[in-house]
Structures are given as C-alpha cells and as structure tokens.
UniProtKB/Swiss-Prot annotation:
The UniProt record lists the keyword Nucleus: yes
Protein name: Probable ribosome biogenesis protein RLP24
Transmembrane segments annotated in the record for this chain: none
Pfam family, one: Ribosomal_L24e
Family membership noted in the UniProt record: Belongs to the eukaryotic ribosomal protein eL24 family.
One Gene Ontology molecular-function label: structural constituent of ribosome
Gene behind the chain: RpL24-like
Organism field: Drosophila melanogaster
GO cellular component terms listed in the entry, alphabetical order: cytosolic large ribosomal subunit; nucleolus
Length: 191
C-alpha cells in the first residue's frame, strides 16, 4: 500500500482518498481534501498558509533540517529482492523512526523552553514598569505589630472592676412579670 503526500499541505493520502489534478504538461498534483484543492486553485502559497506543514517548517515551528529526513527520500533505483536486505530495511526503518521521534520531541522542548524564558522576561519587565501598583504584604507589618502591642498594653492597664453577673431562670422571670411585679421588684430580685 503506497501512502502519497498532499501537494499543498504535505499530509498523508491513503489509497481511495483525495483528488488528483493533472496539468497540461502532465504534472500530477495530489490533494488530500477539497480544502487543499481549492487553496491550490486560488494559487495560495503553502509556505504562507498557517495550517500547512510547509508553513510550520518555514516558520521554525517543526524540525526541518535533520539527517533522519534523508531516509525518507524516494530512490527510483530498482533493487533485486533478497530477504536479508528486506529485514535490515525494516529494522532500519524502526530505528530511524525512534531517532526522529527523539529529535522532534527535543526540538519541541527547546522551543517551549525559549517561550518560557521570554515569558519570564516579559513578567519581569511588567513588574518593573508597574512597581507602584504592587504593595508588599509585609509593607505595613511593623506598623500593625506596634498597633497590636499598644492595644494589648492599653487593655492590661485598664483595671476596671469586673461586673458581677447573676443568672436568673427565664421561666421564673416570666411568671413574675405575668403576676404583675413592678420593675423595682425585678431589680431587687436580680440583686
């Protein structure tokens, strides 16, 4: 099963999918979907259309220059079949894909690390620019501690006599009120 690549977006085209366009000079263009075909008919440049692989490679968002890509090049040289070379080829393909995955993941991590550094620099600049808006949580700490100490000292200095609290049963109080006791009598009751 041969897997073709789209002329416009460079994605894979599996058998039975996509459209072929043949120009008058017998040049064959294969497209994975109508979106790519329409963009080609509108004479769009794949390197300037943001969602294509060509754009991502041109903009440095994906790994573009690497020796592992040399293995994917098509070679139109017929070779005599032998089982050994076939097995070696399969092993080599597995090894190449492993290496390519490692390199692309490393490339992505480096890109993310650069973005993080830029973000930190922007944050530092923003803080320096707007320093007046930021107030440290410890800015008024000394004043608060001094104020609390003064309040505690004031409470300690005040030696007010403690009020004597007497508890009265609520039911008894209600009965007395119903019976018509006066206010003076209630005060005497509390004392």
């Amino acid at each position: 099963m041969r897997i073709q690549t789209c002329y416009f977006c460079s994605s894979k085209i599996y058998p039975g999918h996509g459209v072929q366009f043949v120009r008058n000079d017998c040049k064959v263009f294969k497209f994975c979907r109508g979106k790519c075909h329409k963009a080609f008919k509108r004479k769009k440049n794949p390197r300037k259309v943001g969602w294509t692989k060509a754009y991502r490679k041109a903009a440095g968002k994906e790994l573009a220059i690497d020796p592992s890509f040399e293995f994917e090049k098509r070679r139109n040289v017929p070779m005599k079949y032998s089982r050994e070379t076939w097995q070696k080829g399969l092993e080599a393909i597995k090894r190449v894909t492993e290496i390519k995955e490692k390199r692309t993941s490393h490339f992505v991590m480096e890109r993310l690390r650069k973005g993080r550094q830029v973000e930190i620099q922007m944050d530092v600049k923003d803080v320096q620019r707007n320093m007046s808006l930021i107030r440290s949580p410890a800015a008024g700490l000394k004043q608060r501690r001094a104020q609390e100490a003064a309040e505690e000292a004031a409470l300690m200095e005040e030696d007010l006599p403690e009020e004597k609290i007497t508890y009265v049963d609520a039911r008894e109080l209600e009965k007395k009120l119903e019976e018509g006791m006066g206010v003076e009598d209630l005060e005497m009751l509390e004392a």
